[in-house]
Amino acid sequence: MMSKQNKKDWKKFKDEHKEEHKVENEILEEETDEESQHQEPALGHPSYTALEEQLTLAEQKAHENWEKSVRALAELENVRRRMEREVANAHKYGVEKLISALLPVVDSLEQALQLADKNSDPSMHEGLELTMKLFLDALQKFDVEQIDPLGQTFDPQQHEAMSMQPAPGAPPNSVITVFQKGYKLSDRVIRPARVIVSTK
């Protein structure tokens, strides 16, 4: 049996130990509270909402960059086509200025041929005719074609009407006189034919 004194000592020991344990628990709770306050959510990672916002921004940026690259490629393709067209036109129409400068020479030869006819000089006429043929053959090698529309229907794309006159027996809107022949380089008119057109 425990004596009174022993009971007292045991009670005192228990109370002291209880108090100590209580203080330790309080300290532990305080430390845990402090740690939880300083700790970021989800072990230091940003929240789901923040990640979602970052993903949306990244997707928008990627879409913008994709659109820019598509536009840049389209522009590059347009530039390539334009350059190809310009090079092709340079090959096709590069001699246009030279041909235009030579056309008055052809006109002069034609006028000389008409005068030679009037003067009835066969040798002069033959020489001019040969020169004219050589000249036109040379122009043909450069894809130059003469427009001589006498009797044809008036075409404003290739003919320039100097005047309109009634012409019995001729269909309306047809070329009845050619003042000056026209010329085409490939499919481009470099000088329209100057003509008189019949009326109704």
From Swiss-Prot:
Per UniProt, the keywords (alphabetical) are: Chaperone, Cytoplasm, Stress response
Q: At the top level of its lineage, which domain of life is listed?
A: Bacteria
Instruction: Enumerate the CDD domains for this protein.
Output: GrpE (cd00446)
GO cellular component annotations of the record? cytosol
GO terms assigned for molecular function:
adenyl-nucleotide exchange factor activity; protein homodimerization activity; protein-folding chaperone binding; unfolded protein binding
Keyword check for Cytoplasm: yes
Q: Does the keyword Transferase apply?
A: no
Q: Which InterPro entries match?
A: GrpE (IPR000740), GrpE_coiled_coil (IPR013805), GrpE_head (IPR009012)
Locate the region Disordered: 1-52
Under the subunit heading, UniProt states: Homodimer.
What this chain does, per the record? Participates actively in the response to hyperosmotic and heat shock by preventing the aggregation of stress-denatured proteins, in association with DnaK and GrpE. It is the nucleotide exchange factor for DnaK and may function as a thermosensor. Unfolded proteins bind initially to DnaJ; upon interaction with the DnaJ-bound protein, DnaK hydrolyzes its bound ATP, resulting in the formation of a stable complex. GrpE releases ADP from DnaK; ATP binding to DnaK triggers the release of the substrate protein, thus completing the reaction cycle.
The molecule here is called Protein GrpE
UniProt source species: Legionella pneumophila subsp. pneumophila (strain Philadelphia 1 / ATCC 33152 / DSM 7513)
